[in-house]
């Protein structure tokens, strides 16, 4: 069993056995009912990408390409415009979070990246001094929240650091999420930010190192308990999937495309499970 599958099953069991139920929940299912969840707090995982450990489960198929396209929309296009996500990338699942009448998700994610010129600053800092300890992406902007409606960012903070090991420079990343839907979004979010880590590493010709993942509220919605039990019953693959970025070292961050990524040795258990999302 891969490391990701071990962690996935452990987290499902912990939530189902030790979790508590939410109260006064904000999300709603499409039928209008309150989307309560069972949750635990303070979940943490560590993956050493340089040793082939990747945070993707084989217990069900994960749509990696659309997840990577979303990260390009946020950090390359730097926009909140849903038409860009749909027309350029063919991704539509953010439509449910459109701020009515705006064609956007509000002043969130890509809009905040652009507002603060975050990626240019991160790349400049790493170029001038790779060992600086100030490489922080923060999408938590109270001013923007006051000015615009919209879902507050779940994956809201990413930090980068470097290590030199045997003459090679490795880029590590830490992703912090305030909230995470364990069954639907957990591995999507993790692999998105691994892709971002790989893009920055390629920009400088570095190797990817470790990926640290902290989630404040890790939950399973109350209409997903049957799917959770099914995932626990499934027998995962013994082969570790790998995400590969097929561009030369030194490729500019903004020139990398979704098709440059390849998921190798990925043979997830089927059939796919269906989930009614909480909005």
From Swiss-Prot:
GO molecular function, one term: thymidylate synthase activity
Pathway: Pyrimidine metabolism; dTTP biosynthesis
GO CC annotation, single: cytosol
Keyword annotations from UniProtKB, A to Z: Cytoplasm, Methyltransferase, Nucleotide biosynthesis, Transferase
Entry-linked InterPro entries: Thymidate_synth/dCMP_Mease, Thymidate_synth/dCMP_Mease_dom, Thymidate_synth/dCMP_Mease_sf, Thymidylate_synthase, Thymidylate_synthase_AS
Annotated binding of dUMP, by residue: 133-134, 178-181, 189, 219-221
Broad class of where this protein is predominantly found: cytoplasm
Enzyme class: transferase
EC number: 2.1.1.45
Keyword Methyltransferase found: yes
Chain ranges passing through the membrane: none
Gene Ontology BP annotations: dTMP biosynthetic process; dTTP biosynthetic process; methylation
Catalysed reaction, written as an equation: dUMP + (6R)-5,10-methylene-5,6,7,8-tetrahydrofolate = 7,8-dihydrofolate + dTMP
Intrachain S-S bonds: none
Residues reported in the UniProt entry to bind (6R)-5,10-methylene-5,6,7,8-tetrahydrofolate: 181, 278
Origin: domain of life: Bacteria
Cellular compartment(s): Cytoplasm
Entry annotated with the keyword Plastid: no
Active-site residue list: 154
Family of this protein: Belongs to the thymidylate synthase family. Bacterial-type ThyA subfamily.
Subunit structure: Homodimer.
Biological function: Catalyzes the reductive methylation of 2'-deoxyuridine-5'-monophosphate (dUMP) to 2'-deoxythymidine-5'-monophosphate (dTMP) while utilizing 5,10-methylenetetrahydrofolate (mTHF) as the methyl donor and reductant in the reaction, yielding dihydrofolate (DHF) as a by-product. This enzymatic reaction provides an intracellular de novo source of dTMP, an essential precursor for DNA biosynthesis.
NCBIfam families hit by this protein: PRK01827.1-1
Protein name: Thymidylate synthase
Organism: Streptococcus suis (strain 05ZYH33)
